[in-house]
Structure formats: structure tokens, C-alpha cells
A protein has these predicted regions:
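N-terminal regions that are enriched for targeting/export leaders
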Residues: 1-104, 109
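Beta-propeller blade signature
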Residues: 52-58, 137-138, 187-201, 238-262
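Residue-level signature of beta-propeller blades and closely related beta-rich strand-turn architectures
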Residues: 39, 61, 128, 186, ...
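Entry beta-strands of beta-propeller and related beta-repeat scaffolds
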Residues: 29-35, 120-123, 177-181, 224-228
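Well-ordered mid-protein domain cores that form the structural environment of catalytic cofactors
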Residues: 79-202
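Short, conserved, GDST-rich strand-edge loop motifs in beta-rich repeat architectures
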Residues: 38-44, 230-248
Length: 262
């Protein structure tokens, strides 16, 4: 099916107080629906993947977060990360390319792909950057996960302030160990990364494990991590509702890694 035209709109995001106009809202429904997307005014360049991260939150209970007693709060905010602040100050030196938004400062960390809750904390993620923590109430930026020295930079140009970190857009929270598992690939070599939420990011190289392209998702069982190459292929006709014609690589690697061996 074709993508909705609203995805290509560059209208400025706004807060709204929404009303139910048909049917009845379930009384027992509560909580928050959190979405991630690129900001529409940064969708320039070869494709929209590198637009700066936005957070959208719909409260599922009426009368919260400033909404009236019969309305539901739709709130949004741009992630005010260091790269977003630098780009706002000097937009003239940032250039969207096929491998990211580059500048003399380094590469932007868009953090525009997926929300990741961890207890009462909230992180926003992306394939080509460290996970970013935001305040789940104010949606304000709190910090990137780990110091840049704890990650392996994919340095194809000088990156004095903004490192390019090849990670995954979908890390996982381990409920048994209360840690975050992710990856850090470096020139094709696979490293597993673990973070306890407070200290330094730990990493282990996986001997012989090669990632031809990138790792979009890491998943888990109680004892194992599962990592696969995403083998992403761009097919422009899909955007217009056409069928995919390129199959996934039949030889794309999948790695099963025991957690207790790290």
C-alpha cells in the first residue's frame, strides 16, 4: 500500500487536546502512547532517514498533562540533543548525504526511530548513533548513553564533537539482568554492548562475526542474544504502493550469542 501523504507533510508539529467524536473511550484504558519520527523541517537530502528526532506522546487517560477533563493530551517535542543544537546554530555547515548529516563537528545523532521504555526512564534510538535518554514527562533531552570513548567511532571524516556510532535502532532491555543490550559495529566487525543504566558501557568483540551492512534489530531470549544483518534494500517503487522485487540476501548472517559467555 502507498505511504500516507501526511508522512511527506512539512507542517510544523503542534500540541493538541483531542476529543472522542465517535464511539466511547474504554474506561479502563490508561497510560501513554509514545511515538518517534523525524522532524518534518529536516527531511531534506537524499532521503528522510536522517531527520532530527521528534517525540510524540498521546495520553490515554483524559484530563492529564494539561488537557481538559474530557480531552486527551497530544504533546510533541524536538529532541534538543547536542547535534540538534549545533545544527540550529549553524545550519549552513550541515549537509545531508547518503551516509548521514555531516558537518565540521561530525555527524548528527537523529534518534528518530523508536522509543525504548526502561522502568520509569525513556530512551529514543537510531541505527547510527548512541541511544538518547529523554524525560518522559517534559520530553526534554537528558543525555546520550555512555561517553563517546566507550563506543567505537565509525570515523570516515573528522568528528571532533559528534561521533558516528554504528549501533541498532532496536536495542533490548533484559528484565532478568536489568541491563540494556545493543551492538556497536566497526568496519563490519560485531561488538556486543551492555549498559547497566548508570556506569560505563561495556563491550565485547564477537570473534569471526562480520556484519556486511548493519544491525537494525537485536533481540533476545532469557539466555541468548540474536543478531542479524538487516540487508536493507532501497526500492523507490514501494513508496508509491508497488511490490518489492528484491529478495533479502540469502546468505545474510545471523548470530546467536550466549549472554553468560560475555
Amino acid at each position: 500500500m502507498p505511504l500516507p501523504r501526511s508522512l511527506f507533510s512539512k507542517d510544523a508539529p503542534q500540541d493538541h487536546d483531542l476529543r472522542v467524536v465517535s464511539g466511547q473511550w474504554p474506561d479502563a484504558l490508561s497510560g501513554e502512547l509514545v511515538l518517534s519520527a523525524p522532524h518534518p523541517d529536516t527531511l531534506s537530502g537524499p532521503h528522510p532517514f536522517f531527520g532530527e528526532g521528534m517525540t510524540y506522546r498521546l495520553s490515554l487517560a483524559a484530563g492529564t498533562h494539561g488537557a481538559g477533563p474530557e480531552t486527551f493530551a497530544w504533546r510533541q517535542g524536538r529532541i534538543d540533543s547536542p547535534s540538534a543544537r549545533l545544527r540550529a546554530k549553524r545550519p549552513d555547515v550541515f549537509e545531508a548525504t547518503m551516509i548521514g548529516v555531516q558537518s565540521p563537528f561530525g555527524h548528527t545523532n537523529a534518534a528518530n526511530t523508536a522509543p525504548l521504555p526502561w522502568g520509569d526512564r525513556l530512551f529514543m534510538t537510531w541505527d547510527v548513533g548512541r541511544p538518547v535518554e529523554i524525560d518522559p514527562v517534559t520530553l526534554g533531552y537528558l543525555g546520550d548513553v555512555g561517553h563517546r570513548s566507550q563506543w567505537k567511532d565509525f570515523e570516515i571524516a573528522p568528528q571532533p564533537l559528534l561521533p558516528l556510532v554504528m549501533s541498532t535502532a532496536h536495542p533490548v532491555i533484559d528484565p532478568d539482568r536489568n541491563v540494556l543490550w545493543t551492538v556497536n559495529t566497526h568496519w563490519g566487525s560485531l561488538h556486543i554492548a551492555r549498559w547497566d543504566g548508570e556506569g560505563a558501557v561495556e563491550q565485547w568483540p564477537i570473534t569471526g562475526a562480520i556484519i556486511p551492512q548493519s544491525v537494525h534489530t537485536i533481540t533476545q531470549t532469557r539466555d541468548w542474544l540474536i543478531v542479524a544483518d538487516c540487508a536493507f534494500k532501497v526500492e523507490p517503487q514501494v513508496l508509491a504502493g508497488g511490490e518489492r522485487t528484491e529478495p533479502a540476501n540469502h546468505d545474510g548472517p545471523v548470530y546467536l550469542i550466549r549472554k553468560d559467555t560475555l
